[in-house]
């Protein structure tokens, strides 16, 4: 499969500078005729010495995550065949939100901290596989997350409320302060429970309301997307049932901290058992939660979306086919 007209977006903060090098290799593998991309570090620097005609987009009036979204929209308007995005799960989610409703598929090259979402076509170390590869377009389900009735972002791996997000510092995956991350700072911080005496989580389906958890039961809240890999794995608990019922998403609330990069074995042993509560989510459902401790942040695929106050209400909904992603066919070498 060949792509004559390619849009390119590079997150220069991903992979400790490896994103731009991976972009060069990706373009060599795909060999497009024309490339639309942001000037300089957002993609233009990857085009030096390549034969493709470059269309450089001036993003200088923008900063932060708004740059990727703006470049993505200009690429779609130019009529590209595919958007090649180099970054992590959060960058890919930002781009998917920016072009929501477009027929242009995403080719995601994972250069971030986790790189576990379904929009990742391949990892940076595997970009050589793109040369002469065959792809299939996959319609990917996703989560819409927001606060007080307004959608703020998309998640294709998970949506969480937490004090920290994952980031890479000196080549190591660590927990960093979510509020600091909103301003581009990676400040190490230990995870903390988000729940207090007034915390609540419910699922709504029309007039039917199901209480999921409350108070100290809510140390961690994760909405995610189960799939058929859980089928037959009974130890997965409620997630297994969602996979059997073809429910596109679910919510897990746990009395332990689950999103962490370090764990003291002895302390964890003393704290067991681990108690969790789970509900499946259909497209007709709306998950709502509030009463969090001060400083908790709503995050989607590692992107901090909103600092929550005690009176704010977070919501999550699921939609099938929320994005179009390219997947390497199994017989591709």
Language-model-derived ranges and their functions:
Residues 1-82, 93, 136:
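ATP/NTP phosphate-donor binding region
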Residues 3-10, 70, 235-333:
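ATP/nucleoside-binding phosphotransfer catalytic cores, i.e., glycine-rich phosphate-binding loops
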Residues 12-13, 88-90, 112-114:
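Short glycine-rich anion-binding loops that position phosphate/pyrophosphate groups of nucleotides
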Residues 71, 76, 88-104:
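Short Gly/Thr/Asp-enriched flexible loops that form oxyanion-binding sites at enzyme active sites
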Residues 85-86, 109:
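Structural motif
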Residues 95-123:
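Short, acidic/small-residue loops that bind anionic groups at enzyme active sites
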Residues 112-146, 150, 155:
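Short, glycine-/small-residue-rich phosphate/pyrophosphate-handling segment
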Residues 137-259:
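ATP/pyrophosphate-binding catalytic subdomain of soluble kinases
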């Amino acid at each position: 499969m060949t792509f004559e007209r390619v849009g390119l977006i590079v997150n220069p903060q991903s992979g400790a500078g490896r994103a731009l090098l991976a972009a060069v290799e990706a373009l060599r593998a795909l060999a497009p005729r024309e490339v639309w991309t942001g000037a300089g570090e957002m993609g233009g620097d990857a085009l030096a010495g390549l034969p493709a005609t470059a269309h450089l987009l001036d993003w200088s009036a923008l900063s932060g995550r708004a740059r990727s979204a703006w470049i993505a929209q200009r690429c779609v308007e130019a009529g590209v065949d595919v958007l090649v995005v180099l970054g992590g799960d959060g960058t890919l989610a930002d781009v998917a939100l920016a072009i929501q409703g477009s027929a242009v598929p995403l080719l995601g090259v994972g250069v971030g901290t986790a790189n576990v979402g379904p929009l990742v076509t391949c990892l940076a170390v595997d970009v050589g596989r793109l040369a002469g590869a065959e792809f299939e377009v996959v319609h990917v389900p996703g989560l819409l997350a927001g606060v007080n009735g307004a959608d703020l972002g998309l998640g294709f791996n998970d949506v969480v409320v937490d004090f920290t997000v994952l980031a890479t510092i000196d080549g190591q995956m660590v927990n960093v302060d979510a509020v600091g991350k909103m301003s581009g700072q990676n400040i190490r911080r230990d995870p903390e429970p988000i729940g207090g005496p007034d915390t609540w989580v419910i699922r709504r389906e029309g007039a039917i309301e199901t209480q999921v958890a409350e108070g100290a039961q809510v140390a961690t809240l994760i909405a995610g997307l189960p799939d058929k890999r859980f089928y037959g794995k009974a130890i997965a608990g409620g997630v297994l049932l969602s996979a059997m019922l073809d429910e596109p998403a679910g919510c897990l609330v746990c009395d332990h901290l689950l999103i962490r990069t370090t764990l003291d074995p002895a302390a964890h042993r003393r704290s067991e058992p681990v108690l969790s509560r789970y509900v499946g989510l259909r497209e007709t459902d709306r998950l709502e939660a509030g009463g969090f401790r001060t400083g908790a942040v709503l995050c989607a695929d590692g992107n901090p979306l909103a600092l929550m106050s005690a009176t704010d209400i977070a919501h999550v909904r699921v939609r099938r086919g929320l994005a179009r992603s390219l997947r390497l066919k199994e017989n591709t070498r």
